[in-house]
Regions:
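Terminal intrinsically disordered, low-complexity extensions flanking WD-repeat/beta-propeller proteins
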Residues: 1-34, 38, 184, 188-215, ...
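Loop/turn segments within WD40 beta-propeller blades
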Residues: 59-67, 108-114, 153-159, 222, ...
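Beta-propeller domains
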Residues: 15-42, 67-96, 132
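Beta-strand-rich domains and repeat architectures in extracellular enzymes and scaffolds
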Residues: 47-77
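Conserved strand-to-loop turn within each blade of WD40 beta-propeller repeats
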Residues: 73-76, 120-123, 165-168, 176, ...
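Structural hallmark of WD40 beta-propellers
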Residues: 65-71, 114-118, 139-140, 158-163, ...
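Per-blade loop-tip surfaces of WD-repeat and WD-like beta-propellers in eukaryotic adaptors/scaffolds
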Residues: 36-42, 81-95, 102, 114, ...
């Protein structure tokens, strides 16, 4: 009976079934043929790069039958698709790409269940693309932001609605089905300066924004939107670069008709003591009950979305986060947390055991930034790095091969981590009763 209750609690808190994949994670290997030099250089790029452009974003497809397809987005505005089941016959080559923007692409996200994706770029636009085995075709371009678009994400299981966030501090919601004059899409709604204080300079109110501009109150500045994730169809969670606040928004409201500062329905304020309280990315567990927030203070905080408790439920540490390019994600079952790091490694934690990581992926030589986990099947991980290479990590053989010293270019190494002083105050595994007293972000 106790085991049944434990399993029900794990399901409720987003940890899925009690399958132990630690052995598979321990055997993750990057082979020589799984090391790639990013995406080929844009021949028409206006950027004067003295090195290969970095990969800024990578995501595995969620479309049935295409789960092994990895989308890559580069610093000079190109996107590429990689079949990760195919190992390169000539390693360390660049992937052939398509020019999507003439500026950096900061984020890329797949349309749920489709071979279509959106790209968020430094040229202030979001673009929707149709992908097949032969070509990448532009469907539409979405313009309304004033600054670099940092992130864009679809609503869960919705192929028509997505949101975007930018350095202008604004969040826009777009419906790709909407018809617009001259085929110039406008957002359905918006949250202006979502992580700062603003005043509206126009008296024109409308439920559908017209990309009107708002100015900041003296002494304030727009805080860049760095992460967006939907909890459900009507609830959006956002984080910013400098205000130290996670905000939960009711997207059924029309925030654009209000002249005052937009008010979220819940907020989670930074509880640490560091001056580096900007957030770099958000991840949500499969049951959408636990939020993981990567912070510049070198801690990933988890928060309870069923109670919206103000305090962190748990903390995961041991990596270094010294830039807004360091991202994190979860394994498909929510049992593992993966993050890039400034110290040349990617780190893996067991979500049911907060504290230090259990493994680190060794092989890169600079800051590891974007990371991705294949959505189905045996663990396959992608990591991008400022050393100019991206790597594919697979479950290797249990025993070392004869040519491992040549063929293996990276391994998962176990980590023995001492408990953080604060960790004794945190529950190692969330429980029903724990939700009432545990610290949540």
């Amino acid at each position: 009976m106790k085991n049944i209750v434990n399993k029900l609690e794990q399901r409720y808190t987003g940890f899925g079934t009690n399958l132990d994949h630690d052995i598979a994670i321990r055997r993750l290997i990057c082979y020589y043929c799984d090391v790639y030099r990013g995406v080929s250089v844009n021949p028409d790029s206006h950027q004067d790069l003295t090195r290969d452009p970095f990969i800024f974003a990578c995501k595995f497809s969620t479309s049935a039958g295409w789960e092994d397809t990895l989308a890559l987005a580069s610093e000079d505005g190109r996107i590429a698709l990689q079949d990760t089941t195919v190992k390169s016959e000539e390693p360390h080559l660049s992937m052939e790409g398509t020019t999507a923007h003439y500026n950096a692409i900061f984020d890329i996200n797949w349309m749920p269940g489709e071979m279509k994706l959106i790209t968020a770029s430094g040229d202030h636009s979001i673009k929707l693309w149709d992908l097949d085995e032969e070509k990448i075709t532009l469907i539409n371009t979405f313009n309304c932001h004033d600054r670099c678009v940092k992130t864009a994400v679809f609503r869960p299981e919705d192929k028509s609605v997505f949101v975007s966030g930018a350095r202008d501090g604004n969040i826009f919601l777009w419906d790709i089905r909407a018809k617009h004059p001259h085929d110039h899409p406008k957002p359905d709604s918006g949250i202006y300066n979502a992580h700062g204080t603003t005043k509206v300079l126009t008296s024109h109110n409308s439920s559908r924004p017209r990309c009107r501009r708002r100015s900041l109150i003296s002494g304030e500045r727009a805080q860049s939107i760095t992460g967006l994730v939907f909890q459900d169809d009507d609830t959006l969670i956002s984080c910013g670069a400098g205000d130290g606040v996670i905000k939960v928004w009711d997207m059924r409201k029309h925030y654009t008709i209000h002249k005052k500062e937009p008010l979220p329905k819940h907020t989670f304020k930074y509880k640490g003591n560091s001056t580096q309280y900007g957030f770099t990315s958000l991840a949500i567990c499969p049951s959408r009950l636990i939020l993981y927030v990567n912070c510049r203070d070198n801690v990933i905080y988890s928060y309870n979305l069923s109670s919206y408790n103000q305090n962190p439920m748990a903390e995961y540490y041991g990596h270094r986060n010294e830039s807004y390019y360091v991202k994190s994600c979860l394994s498909p079952d929510g049992k593992y947390l993966l993050s890039g790091s400034t110290d040349e490694f990617a780190y893996i934690w067991k979500t049911s055991k907060p504290g230090g990581p259990i493994f680190k992926l060794c092989g890169h030589t600079e800051e590891v930034t974007s990371v991705a986990w294949k959505p189905y099947g045996e663990p396959v991980i992608a990591t991008a790095c400022d050393d100019g290479y991206h790597r594919i990590w697979r479950v290797g053989l249990e025993n070392k091969g004869e040519n491992d010293e040549i063929e293996v270019q990276g391994r998962a190494e176990p980590i023995t981590f001492t408990m953080h002083p604060q960790q004794s105050k945190l529950e190692s595994t969330p429980t029903f009763s724990g939700f009432k007293k545990s610290h949540l972000f």
